[in-house]
Amino acid sequence: MADAFTDEQIQEFYEAFCLIDKDSDGFITKEKLTKVMKSMGKNPKAEQLQQMMSDVDIFGNGGITFDDFLYIMAQNTSQESASDELIEVFRVFDRDGDGLISQLELGEGMKDMGMKITAEEAEHMVREADLDGDGFLSFHEFSKMMIAASY
């Protein structure tokens, strides 16, 4: 897991972990995990935090080691990277920069990516993903469409 980070990042994570691990027992609690993550500019929701804990606390003792913490940070970082990539893809399709993707923009963007798509297929895709019925895809609608397509 450590290979997901640079030595400098690992050192930063370790320093943050040690600051919270006041008794130096090598473990932090869920509450302390929240503090560490907030100190590093992360603000996970309660459900996300619970899932992270379930992923690493296999014995159910509520303790998180530094290795567990690195795993959690790697998961969190990869989710952020995926979000950043999705934003970039959205911007590529949103050619006029209005925050919405039209049927024409979707079709042109897909053709630019080497995908053969007809105007009718682009229209169908927008209609299927267009939750508010305005004929355009917002970032939220586009994200849902892309996530559904990946499964």
Swiss-Prot record:
Q: Which residue ranges run through the membrane?
A: none
Q: What is this protein called?
A: Calmodulin-like protein 9
Q: Which family does it belong to?
A: Belongs to the calmodulin family.
Q: How does it assemble?
A: Interacts with IQD1. Interacts with ILK1. Binds to ABCG36.
Pfam families, sorted: EF-hand_7
Where is the EF-hand domain positioned along the sequence?
8-43, 44-79, 81-116, 117-151
Record's keyword annotation contains Membrane: no
Instruction: Give the Gene3D superfamilies listed for this entry.
Output: EF-hand
Q: Which GO terms describe its cellular component?
A: cytosol; nucleus
Residues binding Ca(2+) 1 are D94, D96, D98, E105
The free-text tissue note of the record is: Expressed in leaves, flowers and siliques.
Q: Which UniProt keywords apply?
A: Calcium, Metal-binding, Repeat
Q: What turns on this gene?
A: By touch and during darkness conditions.
Give the GO biological process terms: calcium-mediated signaling; detection of calcium ion; response to abscisic acid; response to salt stress; response to water deprivation
Name the gene that codes for it.
Answer: CML9
Q: Where does Ca(2+) 2 bind?
A: D130, D132, D134, E141
Function text: Potential calcium sensor.
